């Protein structure tokens, strides 16, 4: 099966802190906005807060192995994890009506950026948010 680029939305991490380890050998890209959104939930005293804190710990373990902005192997047999910095985003690629001031739209700009950087690979937005998936599919 061909390797894919996966843009993982905040909603996925907040429901499964260990999701990074479930995407086989596909490469995972995290727009910096996802990290900011996860951080907003870490003080909650429920399952969402617990998942936010565990996600941050998982990312910190990977950060200790190398540069997240360059890409770090998640585990042997799994893909790379790379953070997409705000300065990399192709904001001019966002269609009319999508704003760089809306978190979901910045995450979608991350997907457009990765798609442009790796045109020969399929780029997929993974989200539990139905509207996010609908908008992402409309950008193809």
Protein language model regions, located:
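Active-site-proximal, substrate-binding regions of enzyme catalytic domains
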Residues: 4-124, 130-138
């Amino acid at each position: 099966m061909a390797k894919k680029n996966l843009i993982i939305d905040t909603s996925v991490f907040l429901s499964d802190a260990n999701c990074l380890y479930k995407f086989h050998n596909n490469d995972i890209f995290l727009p910096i906005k996802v990290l900011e959104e996860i951080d907003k939930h870490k003080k909650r005293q429920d399952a969402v807060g617990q998942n936010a804190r565990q996600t941050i710990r998982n990312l910190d373990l990977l950060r200790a192995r190398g540069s997240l902005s360059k890409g770090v192997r998640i585990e042997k047999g799994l893909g790379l994890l790379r953070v997409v910095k705000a300065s990399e985003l192709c904001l001019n690629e966002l269609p009319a009506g999508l704003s760089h001031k809306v978190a979901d739209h910045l995450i979608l700009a991350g997907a457009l950026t990765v798609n442009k950087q790796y045109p020969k690979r399929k780029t997929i937005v993974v989200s539990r948010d139905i509207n996010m998936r609908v908008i992402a599919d409309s950008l193809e």
